[in-house]
Each structure stands twice: as structure tokens, then as C-alpha cells.
Amino acid sequence: MTEFDLSTREGRWKHFGSVDPIEGTKPTIKEEMKDLQSTHKNFLFEIEEVGIKNLVYPVLVDRFQTAGNFSFSTSLNLDEKGINMSRILESVEKHYHNGIELDFDALYQLLRSLQERMNQNAAGLDVSAKWFFDRFSPITQIKAVGHADVTYGLAIDKQNVTRKEITIEAAVTTLCPCSKEISEYSAHNQRGIVTVKAYINKDIELIDNYKDVILDAMEANASSILYPILKRPDEKSVTERAYENPRFVEDLIRLIAADLVDFDWLDGFDIECRNEESIHQHDAFAKLKYRK
């Protein structure tokens, strides 16, 4: 058995099974290597989307830096074997300035760079991140950081935007109207998870505070908002407000829809509420879709 010098890293590696590299015969210089992706011939079908998923990169959502989870794709012509996926990361890095800014204008410019770098007509992305914001307790007005989940979706074909959407998911309190109605006192309540996918009108200038407007529709129509910090006066207020505003999942999504339906910057929306029922072993949910 070969003895290795265990006082060195290389010796320990070989002791645990590492071996020396072989003398290879294939090129090691990029220009001499075969580029399979760039092969051109009839590959039978065009591909609508090909790319990468689960790319985690720093992003800026308003004034907070957080982690974004990206998927990127481009189209692929019938006569091309594949895309050069490393160029996707090169395009991302070109737009990285202490975090990729999550707004539609910045993401559009990123897609245009990707489109040009990949030499393809169509490109798209989806990116999810935590959205942090200041939240004040209802009575004592103590500030803390609240959060919701946001997902931006954007796609282009040449210079034209073909898909523009934002999804916001936030937790709220819902108090059961039936429980309140049949009980002598109190009512069961629970955390509800509300998701709104908003389809943005591509032909109208988008208002600056669109995220806040959508989140307000989601939270204000619930039995109560969730707060990071509650002192006793706040807790009293939250408890009583929930009792005064009972909501089924059906009620909540209809009320949210009523708030959103007349905005000209929206082409439509999907709304879902899922209640983590406090007196059942199952969840309750409701969904609706609306298109103009």
C-alpha cells in the first residue's frame, strides 16, 4: 500500500482516494474546442423557451437588498442545436449593481441585453423575492419591518413586451362569519394566505406605487392585517377589528377583486385565498380569475 505524506493537503487527498490528472488528448484552449451548441442544421422544431431556473442573485426591492430567485429563458431557432447558457449569467452580471433592481423598466433592459447576447428574438424572466417595508402598529404606531412575497414576470419579443405581471403573496387574519353567528361569544380565526397575480396593461404607464395598491386591497379587505409588533392597545384593536369584519375566503377574494377591477393599468388578475383553518385539520380556499 502506498504511503502518503499526511502532513500535506495533497497527501491527505490522495490518502482519501484522489488521483493525479491524466494526460488528455482533447484541446484545452477555448478557440480549439468544439462548440456543440453552435451547430447549425435542421433540428426539426423551434423551441419557445430554453434557459435556466433557480438562479439566486442579490436584488433590490425598493430600498432593501434581498435574495432573488430567477428563471431566464430565450427562444431557439429550428436550425440551432442549443443556447450558450453561460451568456445568461454574463447578461445578469452586466446589470448587477449591488443588486438587480426589481422594477419592470430595469428588468426590461436586462431582457434586451439577454436577447442581444443570445441573438434570439424572444426572452423572458420570472424572479421571486421578499418585499420588505415599514409597518406601524395600529394604535401605538411603533415601526417595524413587515414583509410579503413578490414575483415579477416579464417577456419580450424583439422590442415588444408580450407578458408583464406581478404576483404578491401576503398573510392576513380571517375571522369566520359562521362561527361568529352561531356562538354566544367569540369566533374562530386563523391566518389566511392571499395571492394576487396582476396582469399589467402594457400600453398604459404604470403608477409608481402599484405594489402598495395591490397589497392594500389584499390586506384592508381582510378581517385584520398582520403586524410585526403589537402592544396591548394594538392587540385590543386588532382583535376587535377582526370580530367586526368577519370574512369567508369567498368574501375576501370578491372584496379584493372589487378594489382592483376598475384600475386601467390592470388587464386582469387571479386571486386566491387559503385559510389555515384553526378548528379543522384541512385548509379552506377560494379562487377567482378576471380578464377585461
UniProtKB/Swiss-Prot annotation:
Named in its record, the pathway it takes part in is:
Cofactor biosynthesis; 7,8-dihydroneopterin triphosphate biosynthesis; 7,8-dihydroneopterin triphosphate from GTP: step 1/1
Keywords of this entry? Hydrolase
Tell me, which GO biological process terms does this entry list? Answer: tetrahydrofolate biosynthetic process
Chain segments annotated as transmembrane? none
Site positions (May be catalytically important) are 176
Q: Which reaction does it catalyse?
A: GTP + H2O = 7,8-dihydroneopterin 3'-triphosphate + formate + H(+)
| Gene Ontology molecular-function annotations | GTP cyclohydrolase I activity
Alphabetical list of InterPro entries matching this protein: GTP_cyclohydrolase_FolE2, GTP_cyclohydrolase_FolE2/MptA
Q: What does the record give as EC number?
A: 3.5.4.16
* One Pfam family recorded for the sequence: GCHY-1
Q: Which family does it belong to?
A: Belongs to the GTP cyclohydrolase IV family.
Outline what the protein does: Converts GTP to 7,8-dihydroneopterin triphosphate.
What is the name of this protein? GTP cyclohydrolase FolE2
Q: Which organism is it from?
A: Staphylococcus saprophyticus subsp. saprophyticus (strain ATCC 15305 / DSM 20229 / NCIMB 8711 / NCTC 7292 / S-41)
